Amino acid sequence: MIRPLTFAFTLLLLLGSIDQVFGQSENGFVSLFNGKDLTGWASVNTAPDTWTVKDGLLVCSGKPIGVMRSEKQYENFILHIEWRHMKAGGNSGVFVWSEGFVPEGRRLPKGMEVQMLELDWINIHKRNGKPNHIGYISGELFGANGLEATPDNPRGKRSMSKELRCKGKGEWNVYDVVCVDGTVKLSINGKFVNSIRNSSMRKGYLCLESEGSEIHFRNIRILELPPGITTAEQTAKVIK
């Protein structure tokens, strides 16, 4: 029997290279952003003007801090998303397997965060007068607000990428995120460099993060894979 994670990578091999799968052809992927409006998404705790569409791009003002979520839950899937920060030190991310709501007293939801930080963040947020840890801008994976997971390249509870592949302000970055049976593997600009496993949540919502500065998104697509053995405790409650 082919396990779902093996299936996911077998699929990549059959379809071709990362660029071929995610950049040049749909290959069964479904668009999550139509380039015209916010169909398929719901604001959780942001303002009416936080998320807008301009010239076919999804534009996030960064204010206030919060998220918008997908209307649908996802379990096993491959997510393709392209992003660029418009301000030095910008902060954002995408949550997978999220509960899709924000508890009282918090600004962000429970979920697995796939970090998106602009490269100057470590210079703006110095530690003891020196640039902060490079892991922050590497495309880290970590459980947020109660989600537990095991990092494959640990930096505390976070998993940092093994190579620094993110591009800076005004440049487009490409994330391909494979999420199967509690394991998340991240490709940054065409190369798999990070992973985390044993997630306590394995089915939930996608959330896009607004956190202080303008960020643009485009080409948000998803390929759903066969379901796994996911328990009720590992599944987010449906939001009606």
Segment roles from a protein language model:
Residues F22-K240:
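Carbohydrate-interacting regions of secretory-pathway proteins
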